[in-house]
Regions:
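Short amphipathic alpha-helix with an adjacent loop that forms part of the alpha/beta core around
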Residues: 195-206
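Glycine-rich phosphate-binding loop and adjacent beta-alpha segment
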Residues: 219-296, 324, 331-332
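Mid-domain Rossmann-like dinucleotide-binding core that forms the NAD(H)/NADP(H) cofactor-binding site
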Residues: 118-120, 124-194
Length: 332
């Protein structure tokens, strides 16, 4: 089958189109004809060998897919051929077919096309799990969302507003800031301005925010700690700024604050010890919550652009140059 192939560690744009063996159907799995696949900043790290998880080479990158079931193993009764599904997989999304354990496959909500299903898996799954399950964000709390113009950040803004929180969002372009206001952010800051603590404290009357949603890391993390109110929580979910910060715990003591990590990949088996089976109830709960957001209209998955597989380099350029407002999707 045709696929985008990573044979050795290299930049995403330097990968090559090629052929990969058609995966074998195994007990407990379904075969999916892939119609759309998501790529992200993390996809680039994976193919460069810089991610914490290193697939055996050669492999096709891509972990978020949507498509139609074309075959099911004899012991699978949750799905049948023709079902519209989505899944977060180990790798292999940028290919024509994938064979996936049925326990990590979910129906595509009614009314969404193939590309629109992609943000639900990582962007909305990460944000729902982090804000609802981990931070326990409550109505009336202030939440500061960094990187709010990207897929994960947009989802965090929508979910926080749905929960009744007050949102301060940061983004780097006029277009992104306008979209965030449209989606309900109470205050939108220019992320090109290095100092965000001053306006955050002004907006909150000197109190600070209850929750920080940080997908950037680096200096943003350190300044964010100083934006927390007493008893505040800082969610660290990624390091798109490139630097993994270290923590001086004295500030946690002074503010009675909590720093908490959230790795959505843990729920899908992306850890040294594969926990996907044990964590199925928690994963199902998050995905049910995400589907509920779509049904209620609280979530409007935003796809920035859709590219054919042949234009994979152009697709990733949108991410590398930070032009994407929402998700980038490739159709294999």
């Amino acid at each position: 089958m045709r696929a985008l192939v990573c044979r050795d560690w290299r930049p995403f744009e330097a990968l090559e189109l090629g052929e990969m063996p058609v995966p074998e159907l195994r007990p407990g799995t379904v075969r999916v004809r892939i119609r759309a696949a998501g790529i992200s900043f993390a996809t680039g790290l994976v193919v460069e060998g810089k991610y914490q998880r290193k697939p055996p080479r050669p492999f096709a990158p891509g972990t978020e897919i949507s498509g139609e079931v074309i075959e099911v193993a004899s012991d699978v009764d949750r799905f049948r051929a023709g079902d519209r599904v989505m899944a977060f997989i180990d790798w292999g999304g940028l290919a024509e077919e994938a064979v996936i354990w049925a326990g990590q496959v979910y129906p595509v909500p009614e009314g969404l096309d193939w590309p629109e299903a992609i943000p639900l898996l990582s962007s909305y799954g990460t944000s729902f799990g982090a804000l609802v399950e981990r931070a326990r964000l409550m109505a009336g709390e202030w939440v500061l969302v960094h990187g709010a113009g990207g897929g994960v950040g947009l989802a965090a803004v929508e979910i926080a507003k749905h929960l009744g929180a007050r949102v301060i969002a940061r983004a780097g372009t006029d277009e992104k800031r306008a979209w965030l206001k449209e989606r309900g952010a109470d205050h939108v800051l220019d992320s090109r301005e290095a100092d965000f603590k001053t306006p955050v404290m002004e907006i909150t009357g000197g109190r600070g925010v209850g929750v920080v949603y940080d997908s950037l890391g680096g200096e943003v993390f350190h300044q964010s700690l100083r934006c927390l109110e007493i008893g505040g929580r800082l969610l660290t979910i990624g390091y798109a700024a490139g630097e993994i910060p270290t923590l001086g715990v004295n500030l946690l003591l002074l503010k009675n604050a909590t720093v908490m990590g959230f790795n959505w990949g843990t729920y899908w088996g992306w850890t040294p010890v594969d926990e996907r089976v044990r964590l199925t109830p928690e994963r199902d709960r998050v995905m049910a919550g995400v589907a509920g957001l779509v049904r209620s209209g609280a979530a409007r998955p935003r796809v920035h652009a859709v590219f054919p597989l042949e234009r994979f380099a152009d697709a990733f350029a949108e991410i590398r140059e930070r032009r994407a407002l929402g998700r980038i999707v490739i159709t294999p």
